[in-house]
Amino acid sequence: MRIAKILLPVSKLFPLDYLITEDLELNIGDLVVVHFRNKELTGIVWELDTNSEAKKIKTIEAKAPLNLSITLEVLELIKWMSSYYMSELGSIAKLVLPINISEKPIKIKEQQVKNHFVLPKLSEEQKQAVTILNESNKPTLIKGVTGSGKTEIYFHIIADYLIKGRQVLIMLPEIALGKQIINRFIDRFGFEPIIWNSSVTKAQKKMILRGILSNKVKVVIGTRSSLFLPFHNLGLIVIDEEHDDSYKQDDNILYNARDTAIVRGKFDKAKIVLCSATPSLETIYNIKTHKYQLVTLANRYKNVDLPNIEIIDMTKEKLPKNSYLSKILIDAIKGNLENKKQALLFLNRRGYAPLMLCKACGHRFTCKFCSAWMVLHKATKKLECHHCGYQSKIFSSCPECLEDETLTICGPGIERIAEEAMLLFPKSKIAVISKDHAKTPEKIAQLLHQMENLEIDILIGTQIITKGYHFPNLTLVGVIDADLGSNNAELRASERTFQLLHQVGGRAGRGDSKGVVYLQSYYPDNIIFSYVKVGDEDRFFTNELEIRKAANMPPFSKTASLILSGFSESKILDIARKIVQIAPKANVKILGPARSLMSKLAGKYRYRILIIADKKFNLQKYLKFWLGFIKIPSYCQIKIDIDPKTFY
């Protein structure tokens, strides 16, 4: 009796035994059609055997259409993911095969790659970068100031791999960033890359997967999930904006796509290129320890000047009530508009106001399901929780003390800034971009097109606008609240603030005119601002690494979080304490249990246990051994977060 263990793309499932018929020849990695729970699914041949402990064994129906298969390298990646991130094989297989490709034959469109590409002439600095990248056998970071032409450099590397007939993956933190890159790609290479993100339809996914498996798809531009596409001939992985937190998935399987891409590159023997003007501290550490190679671009493309950085001391500004733009910034915007230039106002806070409260009794409007304030959205006339999506009406009186006319709103969101800008600049064309105002890639592309065509004078946006966009006529950036996030107790608060300010400032002055960036702050002496002002990221990285080393925190150590959640706070805390009490003795430091920064989410109370260990310590083996001593009750959900990026 011939048996195959079939890995199905079903969450929390391990490989299952199926019988191989006499006329069927199979190899490990082949895709086959099997029945599972009254459904016909496509699975991966995981192992071949002659014995099975199962009493009733179903038979493999057939090979998948076109005799498609998964490479041994992708199988190795699945195994590594399961081991490193302590996740079930079936959950990871679902990332590789997110759709049943055996359903209905579908036409596969082949990308027509020509060997003649229209690539712009590079500067001497860029040519040297391309040479280093071609010769490097390590993951290589292109670290360049904003507007230095990092994209054009990796386009030259892509051209080499396309000529060799290899497949290429370009990873972006958000596909919203992709529209400008896609257009530039088409201009340079003469064909359209395949796009892979959450908005791709089921039918499109099926077509793309078959195209990749049959080597008819050559170039994919996608978000973090594109990393798991089953390429057969992958030669190059580009990780653009490698520092971005969007590469970390914080639900289902908790994994870092940037780090996993590095591992995939090793399995596939693919070149890895990372890009960022503000690299992550982990990447800087890997360069200093010679695991990665560094390519530096000190100058903007065509030697365009970097913007001036001006810090506005808001303690000295006398603002009218409910106003948030300083006189200095207002005057600068007026001058900018007179010169027919565009401006960007940045505030990383959605909605109209982050808090509504009662002046009589102090009642704050918080989410009934989360430990978070309800955000006022004036356009929809709703209070909304940005964590679970719960909405409520805007009250006319306090629901706690029942007093009338005592409710007030505190602080600005971008809708409030837009309202102020419209009053100050009534003749200007003003647009707002955030997850609320641009919910689809198409809407984002429309706003970007309007900016490029000078149909917008002032763009007001959240973090979504900081990610690598190029607007030649944008010469002024105003950061409304530069303090936001920097006083956070999070490990990476300083790093994120520096990256965010540097990135948003980098949108200014990328054309022929010099740019200027205004940072409004109530703490102008914050050392982060001095690093941003002089553009001294190297000194910032050195200082931050010294702080991390003194605290024995990543990248100088390994960390993992155990996140426990459930509807009864006392029961969850009790389980968390028991877990800590039974921890085996080892060379690790255990902190907690403590309430998560987001102590209640979607109705569930949340506690964290943080484990810190030496870099060489096998943390996964220790956690598996430790958690084997306790049975987690059904009322408690536990997640293991290896290399956590946040502690919310």
UniProtKB/Swiss-Prot annotation:
Pfam families: DEAD (PF00270), Helicase_C (PF00271), PriA_3primeBD (PF17764), PriA_C (PF18074), Zn_ribbon_PriA (PF18319). One of its GO terms (molecular function) is ATP hydrolysis activity. The keyword Phosphoprotein does not apply. Its EC number is 5.6.2.4. Residues 375-548 form the Helicase C-terminal domain. ATP binds at residues 144-151. It comes from the Bacteria. Component of the replication restart primosome. Initiates the restart of stalled replication forks, which reloads the replicative helicase on sites other than the origin of replication. Recognizes and binds to abandoned replication forks and remodels them to uncover a helicase loading site. Promotes assembly of the primosome at these replication forks. This is Replication restart protein PriA. It comes from Rickettsia prowazekii (strain Madrid E). The lineage of its organism: Bacteria, Pseudomonadati, Pseudomonadota, Alphaproteobacteria, Rickettsiales.
